[in-house]
Amino acid sequence: MLFDLQLLGKPDAAGNADVIENRTLAAASVEEAARAAREIVLNTPVPGVYGFRLISNGLEVFHWFIGQEGV
């Protein structure tokens, strides 16, 4: 499966975050894509990354911010 991976900046008080960078990610499942995306966020050289959003077929299937449980 192909996913659009959006690397997100720090969320504001309302929980909205700007997209810093867009990437494409290939994975067999949403869970595998989420694990890979989390590793990208935690080890990325892109400054200001606080989380990510995974999109498949135009729909958000997962999102995560540093400090959240899961993945």
Regions found by a protein language model. Name each.
Residues 8-12, 28-30, 57:
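Generic structural motif
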Residues 1-20:
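Short aromatic-glycine-(Arg/Gly/Cys) micro-motifs in beta-strand/loop hairpins
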Residues 42-71:
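Short, mixed-charge low-complexity intrinsically disordered segments
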Residues 18-29:
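A short, exposed loop/beta-hairpin motif centered on an aromatic-Gly-Thr core
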Residues 28-46:
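A short, charged, amphipathic alpha-helix used as a generic interaction element across diverse proteins
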Residues 15, 35, 64:
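Short acidic, gly/pro-rich beta-turn/loop elements at beta-sheet edges
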